[in-house]
Amino acid sequence: MKFTLSWLKDHLDTDASVDEIAEALTDLGLEVEEIVNPADRLAGFTLGHVKHAEKHPDADKLRVCTVETDEGDLQIICGAPNAREGITVVVCKPGMYIPGLDITISVGKIRGVESFGMMASERELELSDEHDGIIELPSGEVGDRFVDWLAENDPSKVDPMIEIAITPNRPDALGVAGIARDLAARGLGTLKVRDYTPVPGDFESPIKVSIDEDTLDGAPHFTGRLIRGVKNGPSPQWLQDQLKAIGLRPISALVDITNYMTFDHNRPLHVFDADKVQGNLRVHRAKGGEKLVALDEKEYSLQPGMMVISDDKGPESIAGIMGGEETGCTEETVNVFLESAFWDHVQIALTGRALKINSDARYRFERGVDPEYTREGLEHATQMILDICGGEASNVVEAGKAPNHARAYKLDAARVQSLVGMEIPESEQRQTLTRLGFRLDGEMAHVPSWRPDIMGEADLVEEVARIASLTKLQGIPLPRTTAGIPKPVMTPTQRRQSMARRTCAALGYNECVSYTFIDQASAALFGGGDAATMLENPISSEMSHMRPDLLPGLLQAAARNQARGYADLALFEVGPVFHDGEPGDQQTQITGLLVGRSGPKDVHGASRPVDLFDAKADAEAVLAAIGAPAKVQILRGGDAWWHPGRHGKICLGPKKVLGVFGELHPRVLQALDIKGPAMAFTIWSDQVPMPRKSGATRSALELRDLQAVERDFAFVVNADIEALTLVNAAAGADKALIEDVRVFDEFIGGSVGEGKKSLAITVRLQPSDATLKEKDIEAVSTKIVEKVMKATGGVLRG
């Protein structure tokens, strides 16, 4: 929406500057996108007086002028036919930028004679398209600023243009009057209310109007009148200047008046050449297939149900969007029929979209115009036509009636504080709404017809707060029920996820955020892809199922990176996975993926391919960071997408699985186009028990002053016996005394025998109340041997 400062002042009595108005508009929600101030580009130009002018010695059409300026006399070569002695001109001195030519003037020689500047035409200063000669001013002193002369003698030439962005909920701001109303409510001036004086008719209109019954829902109200004896010449200069300033080309008085009403009061109108209309006008729905050449000289084929205005010949206008060329006005037009109607915004939008027509009328009708201004807008436009074009008006013809959108909501002054947090006195709230056009009746606020966005009490609060300025909103801490240390902002689960992200990043991983939707084939590779997780209305076939695991998204990201030459990758993601369609079947995963080598090439040693122990170490680091117990077990038996024999489950006890680490199955990597082996870890953070709540104080560190004792044992067991089985058996011999059990050696072959292996462990004994004696150590050692032999079937190696 564009308008000029002078246009705004037609509706607002204000002394505010352009900057103050722009700041207020943005604060009111009408964001200023651009300000074009002609005074800025004209600030350096000054007035000069041509003291002498003579023919150029080497060019018939050039004159050598001596121009008096504020910096002394300058010799300027000029080719304008009106360059002569005694005139006041606009001087462009060397070093100045000429906007119309897009050059910076400099001292130069023209046909051997030096020129120290130029005298400007209106086109060269972007004041108009006039370039038949240089600017001649009837007044002004040498050295005066040209912009000051324009401000006093021709202010339209330096009228600032403001462009604002209009949100869909504010159609009232598509008229300058609506913008002025907001500024007046803010306190930047006083709104000038235009008097509504109906224009009396001098005769009955020969053209009548009717609306078909099935069209009343889309065209509830139509008004019009015939004006005869008009003269459709150029519009007045003030009207042309205002339209030019906002980028519209003046066409004729009648067209310019309708354009003016569109931007001035958000009231689109249409003017028919009454002598070209045959019979009466009828508003109805198209049957389909009708043709109409519109004012843009394009032919449109109407679809069934579109609203049109027809005479006895056929369609003459696409209702609310664009008129027809056949009944359009020309310079020869003498009698016109002026239309002002209200159209349903949804049907206008559908028709405009189907026909691919973008017009100012469509833009406004599909957002909503004031239904109660239909008749009043007709009267205002009629008066403008009579004032500018002459003629006499008929009585108004009318079909239908304005739809009743009246509504009222209770104004609760306390809700401004509860909803927005601003303390605004009730008297100020009522004054604000009154200035915005609301009618107050006790506690009820009646919404003005031009505000379709006000649909409840909360909207009243928003209007009050908007006019008061949300920039004045002060931060107020939320009340606390208990004093002391502030409660944490994040929940324990959120803190755990945040810590997991920080830890993975510290380990050198890059975070990925992938879609929770994946294709069925990828989901099936990881135990999903069934009907329970299938979307009813997927975005695409590649997003048909909820993901059962984070690994598909990470592997797809890795494949895309490998395709672009990035072979060494460390990626992680924290997010939800879905095993069924019910809310309880959602879990949170922490997953990391390693592909390629452990690091870049280095002169101090070759990098190595990543292996499962890298994934194991990273998984243990993440578990430790999120508070998992230190004593966990590594067991076999992962899912089918893990490489058999090259992965392990991290368990808390024999059944509670906290995570998995290892190498991914080659079949999965091939299906997802991953080159080379890939290591990964997956942690189910929901399975990691939350740490117990601790009190305000911590117990003192307990340091035992008794000497610990370590004993080594070697056992010969079957080759398929896991080391963990042996460790758990040894640790269970005396849980109070045995502090730690570690495997330190494995031997296969030789004297051990076929199908056997030797596992050596170190057992650390830590007494708590007395130093261990030899008999105590021997007793524990005997229990350890018995426990291990019973659990593994092995023997103590001699």
Spans of features found by a protein language model:
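Terminal amphipathic helices with adjacent charged low-complexity linkers/tails
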Residues: L183, G187-E213, C389-V416, E423, ...
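Extended, well-folded interaction surfaces typified by the phenylalanyl-tRNA synthetase beta subunit core
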Residues: G178, Y409-F572, R764-Q766, D776-G798
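Conserved mixed alpha/beta core segments that line enzyme active sites in large multi-domain catalysts
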Residues: L47-I77, D241, T258-E326
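Phosphate-backbone binding interfaces of nucleic-acid-interacting proteins
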Residues: M1-F203, F337, D360, R364, ...
